[in-house]
Amino acid sequence: MLRTHLAGSLRSEHAGQTVTLTGWVARRRDHGGVIFIDLRDASGVSQAVFREGEAAEQAHRLRAEYCVRVTGVVEQRPDGNENPELPTGQIEVNVRELEVLNESAPLPFQLDEQPGEEARLKHRYLDLRREGPAHAIRLRSKVNAAAREVLARHEFVEVETPTLTKSTPEGARDFLVPARLQPGNFYALPQSPQLFKQLLMVGGIERYFQIARCYRDEDFRADRQPEFTQLDIEMSFVEQADVILLAEEILVALWKLIGYEIPTPIPHMTYAEAMRRFGSDKPDLRFGVEITECTEYFKNTPFRVFQAPYVGAVVMPGGASQPRRQLDAWQEWAKQRGAKGLAYVLVNEDGSLGGPVAKNLSDAEREGLAKHVGAEPGDCVFFAAGPAKAQRALLGAARGEIARKVGLIDENAWSFVWIVDAPLFEPADDATASGDVALGHSAWTAVHHAFTSPKPESLDTFDTDPGSALAYAYDIVCNGNEIGGGSIRIHRRDVQERVFKVMGIGEQEAQEKFGFLLDAFAYGAPPHGGIAFGWDRIVALLAGLDSIREVIAFPKTGGGVDPLTDAPAPITAQQRKEAGLDAKPEQAEVKKAEQAG
């Protein structure tokens, strides 16, 4: 080894010892001919001092981020010079020998400052030398180890599934990779290991896990990455409660890393209740504002806007004191979410109602409205009217915005909930409106994915009444973030084919796209289920960071660009020719048949 000790490990008990340290020059200070440097390595920082001799002469040329090796004697710092902010703040290293291992060019940004995102990603290798980014990456490693420890106790088998596979759409677009040896044919990068882990269950593995890389070619969305990581788990001969029990054990182990004990069992909430009360299937339960349904209350209203299939309200505590410009800003906020606006009523201090909506209501409606929605004098009541799903979603978003503006969220709190009994299917138009790819050609598509089993009570009727069918699925939500989702899977070919049929996938297409899975079900496929955790999001939550980019070693921008390597990039004409990108499908099929023959 080039060093005897880590820079961050030195303490008073090392005084008098000769040590060799390696690392980077974080700072250099010159005090009356005596040079001090903060020497940083992965473990922390130690102060090195150059007082005399050849090493002191050499130290004059040191600059920020020079990579160096120093040898010297550990000494107690003089009284009054201690640094209580550093674990090594009681000591310093009196350097006798200095070796510059590598010089550094002038820095594009100072590491003790907060540069812009573009600069950070362009020079990510420098960004990772900073304490925050480095801590996030090391925390991620500990998270991986903690999960593996739990799964090892339960005798799970870690299996690597293919990353070059067949295009089998799962709710987003595939990244495609040309097969050079079969021009015109393409591999797809997996959106998840879903089908392979089910095949592992058919293969008798019984308990599988993988820290899996996944790829989805999605349109631009805030804080999404085209490649991301899941902790993927599958188990044979289990029911929903078994998967949830294991998942909670893993979550408890992860949050212990930051000193928090998750109370278990984690409460359950049905999808229908979550949408009704919070307007979201991933509700943030750290604050208590809820949606109040007002459809029945306004059933005879003279106000045409509220003559709608659904009317709901959410209260903003103290919101009546907002100036007009802020109330106008709420309208713009709603329009950005596809709504026409956000109706509101102000509850005055004397209990009377103000605002443009109030004068359109009947006397009886005005009289009882504050009580009905739970508003107090000084509050503002926001309303949404129209189709229930869209209006609840708008009010759910308003609920979160209210909490942020009013300061209702305890940033140190953790709130977990399981969302269960989600619909098995949703209208295909709803999926495409939210930016997903609707699998199939029917009016219906899967809410989770096409391999989720119906609940037992929906098994006989899901294809005749798709809108009422419930999924045997469960999602885990933390502080308004979906951090994992799973389901009991379909393990019978006839049920899987019925699900495909509801989605408009006929027998021929099903065999073409998913025949390998359907064929496997014919050989005694066991009942099975599992869960996948969003690993990037979980690590970001544990690290107290808002963006998953902060916990990925080399992330891309929101638009899928890597400023470090300039990916994606054009390819040469020769590469294009070799990849067979311009080969026609019929030519590819002939070539494939020839090779098979």
Curated annotation (Swiss-Prot):
Compositionally skewed regions (Basic and acidic residues) per UniProt: 575-597
Entry binding sites for ATP: R216, D217, E218, Q225, E482, G534, W535, D536, R537
Statement: the UniProt record of this protein carries the keyword ATP-binding: yes
Location within or outside the cell: Cytoplasm
GO biological processes: aspartyl-tRNA aminoacylation
Region (Disordered): 563-597
A Pfam match: GAD
Region feature (Aspartate): 194-197
Reactions catalysed according to its record: tRNA(Asx) + L-aspartate + ATP = L-aspartyl-tRNA(Asx) + AMP + diphosphate
Cellular component terms (Gene Ontology): cytoplasm
Enzyme Commission code: 6.1.1.23
Sites marked Important for tRNA non-discrimination: H31, G80
Annotated positions binding L-aspartate: E170, R216, H448, R489
Tree of life domain: Bacteria
UniProt-listed SUPFAM superfamilies: Class II aaRS and biotin synthetases, GAD domain-like, Nucleic acid-binding proteins
Keywords: Aminoacyl-tRNA synthetase, ATP-binding, Cytoplasm, Ligase, Nucleotide-binding, Protein biosynthesis
An example Gene Ontology molecular-function term: aspartate-tRNA(Asn) ligase activity
Subunit and partners: Homodimer.
Family: Belongs to the class-II aminoacyl-tRNA synthetase family. Type 1 subfamily.
Function: Aspartyl-tRNA synthetase with relaxed tRNA specificity since it is able to aspartylate not only its cognate tRNA(Asp) but also tRNA(Asn). Reaction proceeds in two steps: L-aspartate is first activated by ATP to form Asp-AMP and then transferred to the acceptor end of tRNA(Asp/Asn).
Protein name (record): Aspartate--tRNA(Asp/Asn) ligase
